[in-house]
Amino acid sequence: MYRDETKVIQIGDRVIGGGNPVLIQSMTNVPTEDVEACVAQILRLEAAGCEIIRCTVPNEEAAKALAEIKKRIHIPLVADIHFDYKMAIAAMENGADKIRINPGNIGGREKLEAVVAVAKEKNIPIRVGVNSGSLEKELVEKYGGVTAQGIVESALDKVRMIEECGYDNIVISIKSSDVLMCVEAHKMLAGKTIYPLHVGITESGTVLSGNIKSSIGLGIILHEGIGDTIRVSLTGDPVEEIKSAKLILRTLGLRKGGIEVVSCPTCGRTKIDLIGLANQVENMVADIPLNIKVAVMGCAVNGPGEAKEADIGIAGGIGEGLLIKKGEIIKKVPESELLATLREELLNWDK
């Protein structure tokens, strides 16, 4: 089902599905029991633009920590549960806004019913998570290996288990580290369910490889009109996940706001440290709430012309640089003042 037509689900004070904006999610990578570290990381993620946060709940101490964590953050809190149904119940009792479980490994029908009963009482959505790495043996044998068909069949089977308990406040996530398999599976699943989908490429890798895999996979899936929440899974600081997710959504026209920085690839004419300058500009504009394009160009020869599509830009020279607006040179400034001049222009943009 395309995102405009998926079932509307409330997660804390946020709403997904039914054509609502695609929300950005991440997951903490510090022990949930360490409340101070967990809250500090979540607040950093919030500042970067994270809209839903997931924490692992492997034990009772972690479940109890959720209550204190929730008091100090400002976005919905999702509990990630593996195997132990008691942790799912404890997480909900301690304020989780959503739980993520695999109904197939929670301990049987009776225990699943106990989890669903609490979710129903508190109106807490359940995210059904299926990963290609843990696909059931019978489905691997049925389809001759790990396949998109097997992943989708597994997910729908798990959804039915919850529906049979009389509950339909459900979000589905299916993940694979194989990008094309993940794309195929999401296209298949979207045609078979009305539930909103959380989209991500699992085990995607480091910042470099993970960004490439996620950009391709999420880009295709989202462009097809599929997906209600996303996560760019990276091995590293989760704040990097948020930066990447925002850029993916902006590139696809699914998110407005925030300055887009473009820069030239450099050539032999470049007379300034363009790589360093571009990185400085990107960091500098991160907290400026403008919906414009900024160009950072390496020379005065092609810089103005190539920056025509940008709202404003700078181009380097020998000891000096140019301030450009819509391809027109506005003024020359010393190289040492380029960054400050650009920032001043941006801060006074609407004046």
Outline where the language-model segments fall.
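N-terminal amphipathic alpha-helix/helix-capping segment at the start of soluble metabolic enzymes
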Residues: 1-26, 120, 283
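Active-site mouth loops of central-metabolism enzymes
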Residues: 19-37, 56, 75-83, 139-152, ...
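Hydrophobic faces of well-ordered beta-strands that scaffold small-molecule active sites
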Residues: 22-28, 53-55, 77-81, 99-101, ...
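Glycine-rich, proline-tolerant flexible connector loops at the mouths of alpha/beta enzymes
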Residues: 29, 34-35, 46-69, 100-108, ...
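Alpha-helix-loop-beta-strand connector modules within alpha/beta enzyme cores
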Residues: 60-81, 114-126, 186-197, 281-283
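Glycine-enriched alpha-helix->loop->beta-strand junction motifs that scaffold or abut catalytic
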Residues: 72-75, 92-99, 120-123, 190-196, ...
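Hydrophobic or amphipathic alpha-helical targeting/insertion segments
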Residues: 86-127
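Catalytic alpha/beta core domains of metabolic enzymes, predominantly
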Residues: 131, 139-286
